[in-house]
């Protein structure tokens, strides 16, 4: 790495030295795309709801040990005293009322119900143009954002054509959306309500409103339904971090020597804090890292490895709980 760091981007590109594992990661089948779920999520949804998210044409591609904890704990900004309000369960349409009645107000409870309700989607719907063996009620928001977090389910971003230029999507956690001001890795929608409405009107159907109408798009009512869903999402808190003080810095009395060295690098030589500013480690902006400086454009398993454009600065608070990393899952570990 030190040898590479001494070379210019032009030298690395001309000599073909950019590590292949750091190129954009393709979808499990990039030509086909669409939502694909880890098997552990498929099995649990089938057990609780008798709804099958299996695709007949392809399977999820990353090994379970690279994926987030499942089911993930759920923390609320309004009730930090309760700890994990999911009680170790996957929250679904079948158990949400039992778990949250008396904790949420009626508006928030209705928002959670909508986030857990399956609505028609491109690959999972009731028409014969689908990728499930049997007609499907569809996909819920929390099928990807399980327990308000992420299970690393993937899809292709719907905002680019042709197909090779579409990015694989890393499902981001919904923890801490209350401190964020941009939503979507590149579309830069300005509120979580905008993104909630956009997902079902457009992203659920690859940005094609004609197909959306054919397959039964669920048009959410902005003044109540979208508002309720957004309010619940804004309650989802980051997990506890007992070694950090209120300003987001390590408490020297609790942190290890190695962690303190890491913090020194974070604010110093590695220059991470220039974009990932404490206490939540985001500047709420977008940046173009121009990684394409280091390699020539090439087709890799169906995805065109070329310029990515500006990408949102995602918060690093709680980052250990949401592997894999970067906007397209190309980095499987924090070390990567």
Describe the function of each predicted region:
Residues 1-336:
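Periplasmic c-type cytochrome electron-transfer domains
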């Amino acid at each position: 790495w030190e040898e590479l760091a001494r070379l210019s981007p032009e030298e690395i590109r001309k000599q073909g030295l950019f590590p292949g594992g750091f190129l954009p990661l393709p979808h499990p089948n990039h030509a086909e795309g669409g939502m694909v779920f880890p098997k552990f999520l498929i099995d649990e949804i089938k057990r609780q709801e008798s709804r099958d998210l299996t695709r007949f044409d392809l399977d999820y591609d990353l090994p379970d040990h690279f994926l987030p904890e499942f089911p993930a704990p759920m923390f609320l900004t309004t009730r930090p005293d309760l700890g994990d309000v999911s009680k170790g369960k996957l929250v679904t349409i079948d158990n949400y009322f039992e778990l949250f009645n008396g904790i949420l107000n009626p508006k928030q409870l209705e928002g959670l119900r909508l986030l857990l309700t399956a609505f028609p989607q491109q690959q999972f719907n009731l028409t014969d143009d689908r990728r499930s063996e049997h007609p499907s009620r569809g996909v819920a928001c929390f099928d990807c954002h399980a327990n308000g977090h992420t299970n690393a389910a993937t899809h292709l971003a719907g905002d680019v054509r042709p197909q090779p230029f579409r990015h694989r999507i890393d499902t981001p956690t919904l923890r801490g959306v209350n401190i964020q001001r941009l939503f979507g890795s590149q579309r830069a929608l300005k509120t979580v309500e905008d993104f909630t409405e956009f997902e079902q009107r457009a992203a659920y159907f690859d940005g094609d409103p004609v197909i959306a109408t054919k397959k039964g798009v669920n048009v959410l009512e902005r003044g109540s339904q979208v508002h309720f869903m957004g309010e619940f999402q804004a309650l989802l808190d980051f997990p506890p971090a007992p070694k950090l003080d209120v300003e987001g810095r390590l408490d020297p009395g609790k942190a290890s020597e190695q962690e303190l060295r890491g913090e020194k690098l974070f604010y110093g030589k590695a220059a991470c804090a220039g974009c990932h500013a404490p206490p939540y480690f985001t500047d709420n902006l977008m940046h173009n890292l121009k990684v394409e400086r280091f390699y020539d454009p090439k087709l890799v398993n169906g995805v065109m490895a070329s310029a990515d454009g500006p990408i949102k600065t995602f918060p690093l608070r709680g980052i250990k709980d949401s592997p894999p990393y970067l906007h397209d899952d190309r980095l499987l570990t924090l070390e990567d």
